[in-house]
Every structure is written in structure tokens, then in C-alpha cells.
């Protein structure tokens, strides 16, 4: 009950406080800054994310939908993906530079990921389906080393052939970069113990600063 009351209090703060409303007001940014992030929804969302973490918000999720092409992917490669990739490149670059400029790059960890990869082979409808065996993730910021590539897939991007890591390993790594206690055990309302990370999960040491 105490935890529920705490979350309700946080919700009231987010809804009613002048401080919270100010964080969501992108008009407080200079036109140059807004232009640097890009005019599309993704760019402005990334800028909002920076404002939120600067204001003390611990976790921010920015969604960028529209990558699911189960059919006619050739057309998407020509007309759909190029503007999305341009917006993604601009937003991530601006966020990376802005965090560093404001001294937040060692306090904020950024994860750019999808929930799965895409099938290496084109399906009968000319598209690509969901593929859980291989995917790529970009991480930068606090607690992480720079310029490190971990793992490798085969030529078709079908399966890892070098240093495979699991989603649990990734989650464990991000928590480690943020300084969380990876051995912590939480308890459900009925007293059942739940580990913060899976017992089999291991941090990706190659990309952690320590």
C-alpha cells in the first residue's frame, strides 16, 4: 500500500506541478536546439527525453514505430526507410552531443534497441518476419566504454557465431552501468522473492568501464 501511495503521489506531481509542466514545454528550448534534433516526432521526443532526465526523471522511453514490414519490403527500402533512418541518425547524434555538452553523458545511459531482429530470408509476401536469434543493439553513455563492438553474426545475420549475449545479459549490463545491485532480491506483496536479474544473466564486461 505504501508503494502504491508513492506512485500515486508521483503521478499527481507529473500531472499537476508547474515544474513537471515546464519540463514538457519544448518551447523553452532555443530554435537552434530544436532544429538540431530534427523536426520529426522522434527528434522532438529525444529532446524531451533529455529535458526529463535533466530534470531528474530516472527512466525515459522513446518509441519509434513503423519498422515492421512483413510484406513488400523492397518498396519500404526505397520509400519508407530512408526518411526514418535520417530522422533516427539526426536524433541520436543530437542527443549524444547534447548529453556530453551538458555534462550528462556520464550520468545517463542510452539504449537503442528493438525487441527482436528480422528474418534473414525474404518471406513469400516479399517481407521479413520476426527473428529472435540475432539482433543489434547500440548503447552509449554513463558507465560504458566507447567504440567497442561485441559479438558477430554469420554473413546472413542469421545466428551469432562469436560472443553471443542474451536479452537478460543486456538487461544485466544496463543495470550494472547504472550502478544497480545485481544481487538484489525484491519481494512480491505475498512475500515471494524475485531477483532483480536472472541468475544466469552476466554483464557484458567488454563494454563496462569497470
Where are these regions (language model features)?
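Ligand-binding pockets and gating/stacking loops
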Residues: 1-210
